[in-house]
């Protein structure tokens, strides 16, 4: 299928250097708030790129749960493929595609585990069903059927039917510490604005 004529013109207001904040994290916060105010669905969703020697680059969508001057935090299963890739090659990239605003933010840097205490703090805020799911989902592993997974969920729900649910040792957070943050604004005639913090 030839989709060469599938295009639209970007008519956004430009991005001038004088308008950018000195602190890239503050600039990200400003753009993130604008994306949120624009009712962009899952404005905290980003594409996370990792790599390994076996197949090379790999990418998937992940949800941002915290950001501050120390970096960008997301949570996942530590036994997942992405976690194994991060362990071997901690240099990663993330991309926020805020397409309705003709914007994207790209972050490149080093990914590192956060503390168990910090992971527990977030885990405790998750819905109970999601907490149970963290105990029974062997991410990136082949399972025999959907019913097998649902049975594991029922068993975990029964096991933790009373009281608080502990943090699984196989689940927790990562922080991406940026080396570069790039802000991109689409412009007409493909003369886009792009500014990079290093």
Which positions does each model-derived feature cover?
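Binding-site signature for planar aromatic cofactors or substrates
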Residues: 1-198
């Amino acid at each position: 299928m030839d989709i060469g004529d599938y295009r639209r013109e970007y008519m956004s207001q430009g991005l001038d250097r004088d308008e950018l904040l000195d602190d890239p994290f503050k600039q990200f916060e400003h753009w993130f708030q604008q994306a949120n105010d624009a009712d962009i669905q899952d404005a905290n969703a980003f594409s996370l790129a990792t790599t390994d020697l076996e197949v090379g680059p790999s990418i998937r969508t992940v949800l941002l749960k915290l950001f501050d001057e120390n970096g960008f935090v997301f949570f996942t299963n530590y036994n997942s493929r992405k976690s194994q890739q991060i362990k071997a090659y901690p240099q990663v990239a993330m991309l926020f595609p805020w397409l309705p605003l003709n914007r994207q933010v790209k972050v490149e840097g080093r990914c590192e585990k956060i503390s168990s205490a910090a992971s527990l703090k977030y885990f405790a805020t998750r819905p109970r069903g999601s907490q149970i799911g963290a105990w029974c989902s062997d991410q990136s592993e082949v399972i025999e059927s959907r019913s097998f997974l649902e049975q594991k969920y029922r068993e975990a729900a029964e096991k933790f039917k009373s009281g608080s649910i502990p943090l699984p040792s196989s689940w927790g957070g990562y922080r991406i510490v940026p080396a570069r943050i790039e802000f991109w604004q689409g412009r007409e005639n493909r003369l886009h604005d792009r500014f990079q913090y290093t």
